[in-house]
Structure formats: C-alpha cells, structure tokens
A protein has these predicted regions:
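Membrane-embedded alpha-helical bundles that constitute the cytochrome b-like, heme-associated redox core
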Residues: 1-160
Length: 160
C-alpha cells in the first residue's frame, strides 16, 4: 500500500489541488476570521457563544498541528529522506510533552471538525429550526466523543 501511495499517478496534482490549496484557503480565511471577529463571551455567556470562541482557538491550534504533521510526514520525508514510521511516532509520544501536544492537536482538530459541521448545517439551511439544531448538536457531540475515543486509543497505541 505504501508503495502505491508513494508512486501514485498524478500524486502531486492531487496533493496540490485536492488537499493543499483547499486547506490553505480554509486556514488563511480561518485565521482572518479568528483575528477580526469580536469576542462577546463577557457580555453574552451563552453556550453557543463559547463554542464560537472555542472554534477559533481550536482552529489556530489545529493549523499549528497540521503544519507540524505536514512537516513530520511530508516535508521531512521529501527534504531529508527520513522514513515516517511507527518508530518515529513512538519517539514523539515517548515524552509527556510530545504526547500532550499530539493529544491536544488531535482533540482540537476533532472539535473544529464537528463544530464546523454543526455550523455548516445551519449556514447551508439544512438545520433551520431550533429543534433540528439541537438534534444535530447531540449527533455531532456523539461523533466528537466517538472520534476522540478512537483517536486517543490510536495515539496511545504508540505509547510504549
């Protein structure tokens, strides 16, 4: 499987136009929104208001985590020929700081994804009523818990 992925036809085109450019646009636009949005949690202490703020924080943390991931699994491989292997990840999570950063990045990424889906459903008119928004909130919270449990279990499989 690894050999196929390494020598896949049009790999650079797919990586550039299907992964990198959309992710770059999302990251740049997200940083712009995070830096220009007004935080009103002091005045309005509603749950969804806190989710809005956490979405921005999780987005910035996720951006840093994805940059670290791209460096470790793509750029470092291309520039130095280092093999992104099980032992490399085991070495990163062997320290409490590495494990903590990985876990925080993982959880922020999952939160940003699930809360972003909730916002997407409202913005695109899929969940317009308060009841449908509440139901989608429960479903996406369950998805967050499932992804977090699966992701943390996978992460701790690397801990020796």
């Amino acid at each position: 499987m690894g050999s196929f992925m390494a020598h896949m036809p049009y790999k650079i085109v797919l990586e550039t136009f299907v992964i990198f450019l959309p992710l770059l646009f999302h990251a740049l636009y997200g940083v712009y929104i995070a830096l220009t949005s007004s935080v009103t949690v002091q005045r309005y202490r509603y749950f969804r208001n806190w989710c809005y703020v956490l979405q921005r924080i999780a987005g910035i943390v996720t951006l840093l985590f994805v940059m670290w991931h791209i460096y470790g699994t793509k750029l470092q491989v291309e520039l130095t020929g280092v093999d992104p292997s099980y032992s490399m990840v085991t070495g990163i999570v062997a320290t409490p700081i590495g494990l903590g950063l990985f876990a925080i990045g993982l959880l922020c990424s999952i939160y940003h994804f699930c809360n972003g889906l909730w916002t997407f459903l409202i913005t695109w008119g899929i969940t317009v009523s308060p009841h449908s928004q509440k139901i989608s909130g429960y479903v996406l919270f369950a998805l967050f818990i499932a992804f977090a449990a699966f992701g943390l279990k996978a992460l701790f499989a690397f801990v020796g």
